[in-house]
């Protein structure tokens, strides 16, 4: 599923991401835009053999199990396929664990490069939330 900007903001808010660990909703919407272009089915292979999955491009080396990543930790205790669902609950729950891990949203390279330090409120502007 490819979410609309405001549709995704509403879903993320409903699932408790707004101001989770101090990150406003705009940060999460911005991260999803530049990680997956709001597409829940996005997958990208990395040079180390791991793969990033779903709307927030969650990595199989640390966070989920795809059965093909050597030394996978699966810290969210989920199959990576769960992160490709049109229902973003699994992705959001895992993202909460990731953002609580010490580096905050810096864990997402696209957030660090494209969202951090910008006016992220623009991502939720005009949305009925």
UniProtKB/Swiss-Prot annotation:
Give the enzyme's main class according to its UniProt record, as a single word.
hydrolase
Question: Example GO biological process term?
Answer: defense response to Gram-negative bacterium
Gene Ontology molecular function, alphabetical: lysozyme activity
The organism named in the record is Chrysolophus amherstiae
Question: Where is the protein situated, by its record's location annotation?
Answer: Secreted
Protein name as it appears in the record? Lysozyme C
| The family this protein is said to belong to | Belongs to the glycosyl hydrolase 22 family.
- EC number per UniProt: 3.2.1.17
C-type lysozyme domain mapped to chain residues: 1-129
**Alphabetic keyword roster:** Antimicrobial, Bacteriolytic enzyme, Disulfide bond, Glycosidase, Hydrolase, Secreted
């Amino acid at each position: 599923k490819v979410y609309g900007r405001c549709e995704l903001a509403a879903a993320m808010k409903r699932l408790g991401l707004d101001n989770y660990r101090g990150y406003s909703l705009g940060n999460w919407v911005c991260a999803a835009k530049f990680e997956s272009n709001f597409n829940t089915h996005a997958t990208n292979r990395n040079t180390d053999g791991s793969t990033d999955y779903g709307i927030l491009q969650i990595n199989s080396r640390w966070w989920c199990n795809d059965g093909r990543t050597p030394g996978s930790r699966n810290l969210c205790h989920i199959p990576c396929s769960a992160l490709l669902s049109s229902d973003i609950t699994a992705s959001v729950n895992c993202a909460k664990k990731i953002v609580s891990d010490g580096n905050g949203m810096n864990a997402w390279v696209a957030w660090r490069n494209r969202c951090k330090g910008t006016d992220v409120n623009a991502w939720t502007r005009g949305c009925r939330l």
